[in-house]
UniProtKB/Swiss-Prot annotation:
Signal peptide: none annotated. It is a multi-pass membrane protein. The lineage of its organism: Bacteria, Bacillati, Actinomycetota, Actinomycetes, Micrococcales. Key component of the proton channel; it plays a direct role in the translocation of protons across the membrane. CDD domains: ATP-synt_Fo_a_6. This is ATP synthase subunit a. Keywords: ATP synthesis, Cell membrane, CF(0), Hydrogen ion transport, Ion transport, Membrane, Transmembrane, Transmembrane helix, Transport. The keyword Transport applies. Its main location: membrane. F-type ATPases have 2 components, CF(1) - the catalytic core - and CF(0) - the membrane proton channel. CF(1) has five subunits: alpha(3), beta(3), gamma(1), delta(1), epsilon(1). CF(0) has three main subunits: a(1), b(2) and c(9-12). The alpha and beta chains form an alternating ring which encloses part of the gamma chain. CF(1) is attached to CF(0) by a central stalk formed by the gamma and epsilon chains, while a peripheral stalk is formed by the delta and b chains.
């Protein structure tokens, strides 16, 4: 594909996508590379969108809910019952519903940006945002574990019960690395890598269609139709993955919180 694109690039008729495609321009006159970018604006806008929707949905509550109230209640119930209650359970789950609810819809909206024409860039396709989200979750479940079990939590989290003492020198370092070093990294990279890969595939498919359409060869022009069909299929799959990743990130957060609350039983 690159070899085919090079002659067209030299003639000035086609430019293959590069790394600049992954960086939205700054929207303020200062800080062209590290200023307030459109991506930052999209993150702020997502908060406004979520807050506005649920405020309007809960503003005039009725016994027989309207469409907006029904949608809001279904969205809340999905996180409350389908994630928090099912995973954390007991009487503890209710206090963590606001956190899980906020995480799910914040990630969902920022992911869905990638499926909206013109924008077409999920906020978490840049690793910084994914690191921040995973960092918040990381310190949250550690604090929860310490609050529930005291400093004994670190022993409970790294020394599995029922393991023979002579195996502990092998198991404990593995548990420390797995729980306190690898876990936050994989939690963030899973979100980032999925969003980045999906965005790259859609972007390359679009560039491939543009390149093929610009060719004089009829067969190449016809091939653009096949690429278009594949691009539409990938676009639909990517939209599904955007929602799925929001669910997976929130589900793992609930699992980590449950583990911190019941570390003594693991």
């Amino acid at each position: 594909m690159i070899a085919l694109a090079l002659p067209a690039q030299d003639s000035g008729s086609f430019t293959p996508p590069g790394i600049d495609e992954m960086h939205l321009p700054a929207i303020l006159p200062w800080g062209a590379h590290d200023g307030f970018s459109k991506q930052m604006l999209l993150v702020i806008l997502s908060v406004v969108i979520i807050a506005t929707f649920f405020i309007l949905a809960a503003r005039k509550q009725q016994l027989v809910p309207g469409k907006l109230q029904f949608a809001g209640e279904m969205a809340y119930g999905f996180v409350r019952n389908g994630i928090a209650k099912d995973i954390i359970g007991g009487k503890d789950f209710i206090k963590y519903v606001p956190l899980l609810f906020s995480l799910f819809f914040f990630i969902l909206v920022n992911n869905i940006y990638g499926a909206i024409p013109v924008i077409q860039l999920p906020s978490f396709s840049h690793v910084g945002g994914a690191y921040v989200m995973a960092g918040i979750v990381y310190f949250t479940w550690i604090i929860i574990g310490i609050k529930k079990n005291g400093l004994k939590y670190f022993k409970l989290a790294t020394v599995p019960s029922g393991v023979p003492w002579y195996i502990l020198p092998i198991v404990v370092p593995i548990e420390i690395i797995s729980n306190f070093l690898v876990r936050p990294v994989t939690h963030s990279l899973r979100l980032f890598a999925t969003m980045l890969a999906g965005h790259l595939i859609v972007m390359l498919a679009g560039s491939g269609i543009e390149f093929l359409v610009m060719q004089e060869n009829v067969l190449l022009k016809g091939a653009s139709v096949l690429v278009l069909v594949g691009a539409v299929a990938m676009y639909m799959l990517e939209a599904l993955i955007m929602a799925l990743q929001a669910y997976v990130f929130t589900l793992l957060t609930a699992i980590y919180i449950e583990g911190a609350l019941h570390a003594d039983s693991h």
